[in-house]
């Protein structure tokens, strides 16, 4: 899926997160998680409505859990020009197992308790 891009100021540091990540394991069992995206803009960013639709579209996709961070990374790289792109995914598998997966640039995601929290 190609994401819609928006023009912004070059050099803007951006971090997106969504607690609504849901996709199917190869077994058909659901994985739930939180997606964190971090990058420096080269003059473009993702349209947030399109990004939300993309995240929702993953619900119909079967992936190995270990591949989901790369899949999001690849989609963003194919859609907009960015620098320092990093993806972190915190997953909960059926049975309560927790995983943290990362692809691209290493970063520590800001995990907010509410939308008004400032670090």
Enumerate the language-model features and the residues they cover.
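N-terminal intrinsically disordered, cationic/polar leader segments
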Residues: 1-119
């Amino acid at each position: 899926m190609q994401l819609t891009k928006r023009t912004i100021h070059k050099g803007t540091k951006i971090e997106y997160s969504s607690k609504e990540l849901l996709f199917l394991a190869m077994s058909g069992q659901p994985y739930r998680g939180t997606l964190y995206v971090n990058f420096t803009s080269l003059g473009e960013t993702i349209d947030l409505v399109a990004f939300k639709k993309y995240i929702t579209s993953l619900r119909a996709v079967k992936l190995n859990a270990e591949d989901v961070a790369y899949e999001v990374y690849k989609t963003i790289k194919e859609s907009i020009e960015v620098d320092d792109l990093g993806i972190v995914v915190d997953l909960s598998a059926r049975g309560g197992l927790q995983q943290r997966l990362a692809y691209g640039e290493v970063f520590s995601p800001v995990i907010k308790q509410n939308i008004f929290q400032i670090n």
